[in-house]
């Protein structure tokens, strides 16, 4: 009798269980006894791999470390307590023993495990978009919701503006004005021509920043311009799908010559928000806050409800109709994505 064909979800679950089994097996390979380790010291996680992490000590030296099994999830930017080994074991030089409380973190939805943290202790999120494959205000709004909820300052960067004719550039600037009007900072740059790159590096010097955005928007090109010695692999936009080809495999923290730190993380084709509810997404729109709670009905859905203060603010020109429409698209997508819990990672 022919075997019944597995569904896509069953195949994914089998692959996930297999990967977790291999992960547990590998963790047993290296066991550190207390006498093999030196004194505790402070460090920062600069790269996170599946079962190891690279930690930078206070002298700027980087060591590959194992993780204590009692630790919760570890991400780039985490401040940790670790101990250096007296010798290397299978290329590992020490053990991370504790994680300091995080000032903040950003996470993305994970198909199997709910939320998966990406990075921690961030001062600014650089939302990189581009004129190719297309400028998506909906994607920008998704990232801004995350910034508002996490309490992290965003910077909207439009890359590859050298590809625009003057008329096209004016049209893009008009589209982005809705963000400037509510206090978001916009920077139009070109890694190729160098336009406004000095302004970007000056902003990056003000703390720890992370680049986010779809693949193909030029994040790796920007890093190559800011840090030529890194030589991050650059990916092209697929002619077939219009989506960027993945170039970064692990999140990594870089120190910038002019000061500050930059975290580069793997590209995400679709930044899912299914882990949020409608109330959280509403709080992610900063210009909505002054009218929330003033609607006629407490359970107002902010659509055709009578006495909706939010809709009235849109009609009066106080709130952008584009942002208002994007907001409802995000709300409508919640039930769909929560039932499927499916998004595409590069």
From Swiss-Prot:
Provide GO CC annotations from the record: cytoplasm
E.C. numbers: 3.6.1.-
- Per UniProt, Zn(2+) binds at 295, 300, 302, 308
Describe the location of the CP-type G domain by residue ranges: 103-271
Gene Ontology terms for molecular function: GTP binding; GTPase activity; metal ion binding; rRNA binding
Report the co-factor binding details.
Binds 1 zinc ion per subunit.
Which keywords has UniProt assigned to this entry? Cytoplasm, GTP-binding, Hydrolase, Metal-binding, Nucleotide-binding, Ribosome biogenesis, RNA-binding, rRNA-binding, Zinc
Name the coenzymes or cofactors required: Zn(2+)
Q: What subcellular compartments does it reside in?
A: Cytoplasm
PROSITE patterns under this entry?
ENGC_GTPASE (PS50936), G_CP (PS51721)
List where Polar residues composition bias occurs.
7-20
State the residue spans of region: Disordered. 1-26
Q: Which Pfam families match?
A: RsgA_GTPase
Could you mention a single GO BP entry for this protein?
Answer: ribosomal small subunit biogenesis
Quick one: which residues bind GTP?
159-162, 213-221
Described by its record, this protein's role is as follows: One of several proteins that assist in the late maturation steps of the functional core of the 30S ribosomal subunit. Helps release RbfA from mature subunits. May play a role in the assembly of ribosomal proteins into the subunit. Circularly permuted GTPase that catalyzes slow GTP hydrolysis, GTPase activity is stimulated by the 30S ribosomal subunit.
UniProt subunit comment = Monomer. Associates with 30S ribosomal subunit, binds 16S rRNA.
Family assignment from sequence similarity: Belongs to the TRAFAC class YlqF/YawG GTPase family. RsgA subfamily.
| UniProt-recorded name of the protein | Small ribosomal subunit biogenesis GTPase RsgA
- Species source reads Haemophilus influenzae (strain PittEE)
